[in-house]
């Protein structure tokens, strides 16, 4: 990116700096989590560390753009399925920006990472992953949007929310590419517990 374009982006980033912090619209603030207001599943990242980490360029749009590797303890007996959702509440869009939605993760799984998002093929907008997980909708219609906050907009938070479900989702009961709102409704009455891993990333002048 040229210096002029960077300067323009920086100016816009500063102009819209206060457009951030849409925490009230986060996934875990939806009605489905009414009985589970706090995370109880401990999540860590062998790559990036504990929650509260600062992401390196490697995990951004300016690096490989891969999702961090995550691990968590074995699920309780009542857990029938997991799902994972990643979002940025600091995007200047008036609502959190969804970076990725992944459904139908088996209850025996205790890790999630880049290899789970390997794309085999795409048919009519439906992405087929090696892992078999269903990919939900984000604004770029890709498997995962790597962090790329506007220059000058300060650090953004990236929340990776793992949800343990007491009932499996019906594969035929949700869209082939479900969005966040649809998932929020689909999991009402099914949330057994959930975990949160959060990291920050800020675009800098020395990026490519």
Swiss-Prot record:
Alphabetical list of SUPFAM superfamilies matching this protein: PEBP-like (SSF49777)
Q: Which family does it belong to?
A: Belongs to the tstB family.
Which Pfam family, any one of them, does this sequence belong to?
A: PBP
What role does it play?
Answer: Phosphatidylethanolamine-binding protein; part of the gene cluster that mediates the biosynthesis of the antihypercholesterolemic agents phomoidrides which are dimeric anhydrides. Within the pathway, phiB is not essential for dimerization and its function has still to be determined. The pathway begins with the highly reducing polyketide synthase phiA that catalyzes the formation of a C12-fatty acyl-ACP, starting from one acetate and 5 malonate units. The hydrolase phiM is involved in the release of the C12-fatty acyl chain from phiA.
Protein name, as recorded:
Phomoidride biosynthesis cluster protein B
Q: Which organism is it from?
A: Fungal sp. (strain ATCC 74256)
Q: Which CDD domains match?
A: PEBP
The free-text biotechnology note states:
Phomoidrides A and B (also known as CP-225,917 and CP-263,114) are potent inhibitors of Ras farnesyltransferase and squalene synthase. CP-225,917 and CP-263,114 inhibit Ras farnesyl transferase from rat brain with IC(50) values of 6 uM and 20 uoM, respectively. CP-225,917 inhibits squalene synthase with an IC(50) value of 43 uM and CP-263,114 with an IC(50) of 160 uM.
Q: What is the lineage of its organism?
A: Eukaryota, Fungi
Supply the gene name.
phiB
Q: Which InterPro entries does the entry link to?
A: PEBP, PEBP-like_sf, PhiB
């Amino acid at each position: 990116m040229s210096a002029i374009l960077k300067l323009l982006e920086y100016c816009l980033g500063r102009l819209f700096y206060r457009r951030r912090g849409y925490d009230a619209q986060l996934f875990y603030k939806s009605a489905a989590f009414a009985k589970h207001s706090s995370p109880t599943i401990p999540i860590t990242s062998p790559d990036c560390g504990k929650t509260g980490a600062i992401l390196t360029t490697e995990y951004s749009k300016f690096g490989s753009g891969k999702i961090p590797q995550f691990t968590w303890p074995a699920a309780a007996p009542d857990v029938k399925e997991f799902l994972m959702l990643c979002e940025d509440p600091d995007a200047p869009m008036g609502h959190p920006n969804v970076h990725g939605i992944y459904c139908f993760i088996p209850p025996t799984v205790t890790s999630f990472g880049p290899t789970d998002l390997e794309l085999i093929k795409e048919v009519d907008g439906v992405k087929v992953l090696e892992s078999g997980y269903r990919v939900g909708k984000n604004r770029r219609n890709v498997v995962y949007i790597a962090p790329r906050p506007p220059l000058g907009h300060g650090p953004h938070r990236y929340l990776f929310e793992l949800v343990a479900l007491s009932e499996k989702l019906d594969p035929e009961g949700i869209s082939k590419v479900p969005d966040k709102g649809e998932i929020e409704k689909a999991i009402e009455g099914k949330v057994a517990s959930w975990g949160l891993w959060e990291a920050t990333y800020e675009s800098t002048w020395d990026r490519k």
